[in-house]
């Protein structure tokens, strides 16, 4: 079972997001979808629901409600958490890295 989410470093999370996520995702309101969906407003939304993005059936059917814990769990191993996801990212194995990136995302994706 994945480790419980704990608030991390927003600054370190921003760096991680830039190097690990930004090539496929945007976070700003009204930002475009890229290879992956725009993540603005992701927290409190169900998986597979970003308007205008074409998700796999797996993401839609999983119907995860994204919060700090579910996002952290997903980022540990996306393909294990949602088998059939398009997300090619292998995951963040270090608990600290997941905490940092989720802490950053909580602010950046509002």
Swiss-Prot record:
InterPro entries with a match to the protein in the record: Cyt_c-like_dom (IPR009056), Cyt_c-like_dom_sf (IPR036909), Cyt_c_1A/1B (IPR002327)
GO molecular function annotation: electron transfer activity; heme binding; metal ion binding
Gene3D superfamilies (alphabetical): Cytochrome c-like domain (1.10.760.10)
Free-text function comment from the UniProt entry: Electron carrier protein. The oxidized form of the cytochrome c heme group can accept an electron from the heme group of the cytochrome c1 subunit of cytochrome reductase. Cytochrome c then transfers this electron to the cytochrome oxidase complex, the final protein carrier in the mitochondrial electron-transport chain.
Pfam families listed in its UniProt record: Cytochrom_C
PROSITE patterns: CYTC (PS51007)
Predominant location: mitochondrion
Underlying gene: CYCK
Any coiled-coil regions, as ranges: none
Compartments reported by the entry: Mitochondrion intermembrane space
Binding sites annotated in the UniProt record for heme c: 21, 24-25, 87
Origin superkingdom: Eukaryota
Alphabetical keyword list: Electron transport, Heme, Iron, Metal-binding, Mitochondrion, Respiratory chain, Transport
Protein family membership: Belongs to the cytochrome c family.
The protein's name in its UniProt record: Cytochrome c
GO annotation, cellular component aspect: mitochondrial intermembrane space
Lineage of origin: Eukaryota, Fungi, Dikarya, Ascomycota, Saccharomycotina
Free-text description of this protein's post-translational modifications in UniProt: Binds 1 heme c group covalently per subunit.
